[in-house]
UniProtKB/Swiss-Prot annotation:
Function (record text): Catalyzes the reversible conversion of 2-phosphoglycerate (2-PG) into phosphoenolpyruvate (PEP). It is essential for the degradation of carbohydrates via glycolysis.
Name used for this protein in its record: Enolase
Pfam families hit by this protein: Enolase_C, Enolase_N
Gene Ontology BP term (one): glycolytic process
Gene3D superfamilies from the UniProt entry: Enolase-like C-terminal domain, Enolase-like, N-terminal domain
Family: Belongs to the enolase family.
Catalytic activity: (2R)-2-phosphoglycerate = phosphoenolpyruvate + H2O
NCBIfam families assigned: eno
EC number, as in UniProt: 4.2.1.11
Cofactor(s) the record lists: Mg(2+)
Gene Ontology cellular-component terms listed: cell surface; extracellular region; phosphopyruvate hydratase complex
Residues that, per the record, bind Mg(2+): D242, E287, D314
Annotated binding of (2R)-2-phosphoglycerate, by residue: Q163, K339, R368, S369, K390
Length: 429
């Protein structure tokens, strides 16, 4: 039995210099698991609650000492002595202990740190790499990365309304070569921006954040960078967007306001706007193309683009099986973004991935804009054979930690490692 004998929660800092929760779980055998949780900037209203202290005199109210205290007291008492290999039972214990629908009492940040640390300790105890512990012998597929090379919206201080412009290398036969492709495009883009006298400063997720006059200008520049790096847009590399449309949706008026372009659009008009971009550029994936509460708009977008473009629900589904089930039944979107801190335990995370796959939806494993050096999501991506990962640009060590872990996993898998390329979009025609 892998009995838990000690649990230590602590406050550490994330990639934005804000406090977050880290947890150590020690087992009877002496092995330890350590995990740190991320934090988002643009968040869905139905995400599990991240517990913050609210003391404005300390870290501007963003301290997490209450969450840490919950780990070191209540949670510790509840799971001390339990078997770390019983992940589902441990997570259910945490959920029952919290007793709320949104994990607002103990805090999803406290619960997730414990859930992850327990899994890492159990994997160590079993002598297995984490991806293998999660997925067993069937875990062998590396994910296609969504590489966020231009940041806008809530992730940058510029004129772009769309939050993320991403490249997805798809013609390569290994993750290593896909990563090289993305890195070369990133550096080609930096040179193009510098030559134009545009900013090469990076945003929260490591992408550039220059002031483009329009979304089309940004996309054209990315296509130039792909070609400058020696690749073919539409063949070797596809494009992806994260609109984060909830951030510029005005519910009272029912309009999407693209301030950077001086546009006010209805849901139908915004769906047409996105369809026009897909006609002009090799866009294979659009995340949060409509606001989380605009389900009619989502239905319009899905009917218009859902057979040829991956439509990913992030704020829409918030990694929640109840909401995802409703979306599947109504034919909303065709993919879910998986963010472990939106739901707060690994068991619930895996349930959302499984539900998506059974319905023919894709699942994209994702970081948050406020990250840490923790690379668990890389192991989740391979352990679940998700096929896609979204973990930032080709700069900032908090993003590189995930990419480098995927390189290690691919090396560990050896000849049985596979890279899906365009096959990652198994539900598109």
């Amino acid at each position: 039995m892998s009995a838990i004998v000690d649990i230590i929660g602590r406050e550490v800092l994330d990639s934005r210099g804000n406090p977050t929760v880290e947890c150590d779980v020690l087992l009877e055998s002496g092995v330890m698991g350590r995990a740190a949780v991320p934090s988002g900037a643009s968040t869905g209203s139905r995400e599990a609650i991240e517990l913050r202290d609210g003391d404005k005199g300390r870290y501007l109210g963003k301290g997490v000492l209450k969450a840490v205290e919950h780990i070191n007291t209540e949670i510790s008492e509840a799971i001390m002595g339990l078997d770390a290999s019983e992940q589902a039972f441990l997570d259910r214990t945490l959920i029952d202990l919290d007793g709320t629908e949104n994990k607002g009492r103990l805090g999803a940040n406290a619960m997730l740190a414990v859930s992850m640390a327990v899994a890492k300790a159990a994997a160590e105890e079993a002598g297995l790499p984490l991806y293998r512990y999660f997925g067993g012998s069937g875990a062998m597929q590396l994910p296609v990365p969504m590489m966020n090379i231009v940041n806008g919206g809530a992730h940058a201080n510029n004129s772009l309304d769309i939050q993320e412009f991403m490249v997805m290398p798809v013609s390569q036969t290994s993750f290593r070569e896909a990563l090289r492709c993305g890195a070369e495009i990133f550096h080609a883009l930096k040179k193009i921006l510098a030559d134009k006298g545009m900013s090469t400063a990076v945003g929260d997720e490591g992408g550039f954040a220059p002031n483009f006059s329009s979304n089309e200008e940004c996309l054209n520049t990315i296509v130039q960078a792909i070609e400058k790096a020696g690749y073919r847009a539409g063949e070797d590399v596809l494009l992806a967007l994260d609109c984060a449309a909830s951030e510029f949706y005005h519910e009272a008026e029912g309009v999407y306001q693209l301030e950077g372009e001086g546009l006010k659009l209805s849901s139908t008009q915004f769906a047409d706007y996105l369809a026009n971009l897909c006609d002009k550029f090799p866009i294979v994936s659009i995340e949060d193309g409509m606001a989380e509460g605009d389900w009619d708009g989502w239905k319009t977008l899905t009917d218009k683009l859902g057979k040829r473009v991956q439509l990913v629900g992030d704020d829409l589904f918030v990694t929640n099986t109840k909401i995802l089930k409703e979306g599947i039944e109504k034919g909303i979107g065709n993919s879910i973004l998986i963010k472990i801190n939106q739901i707060g335990t690994l068991t619930e995370t895996f349930a959302a991935i499984e539900m998506a796959k059974r319905a023919g939806y894709t699942a994209v494993i994702s970081h948050r804009s406020g990250e840490t050096e923790d690379s668990t999501i890389a192991d989740i991506a391979v352990g679940t054979n998700a096929g896609q990962i979204k973990t930032g640009s080709l700069s900032r060590s908090d993003r590189m930690a995930k990419y480098n872990q995927l390189l290690r996993i691919e090396e560990d898998l050896g000849d049985i490692a596979s890279y899906p390329g365009k096959g990652a979009f198994y539900n598109l025609r």
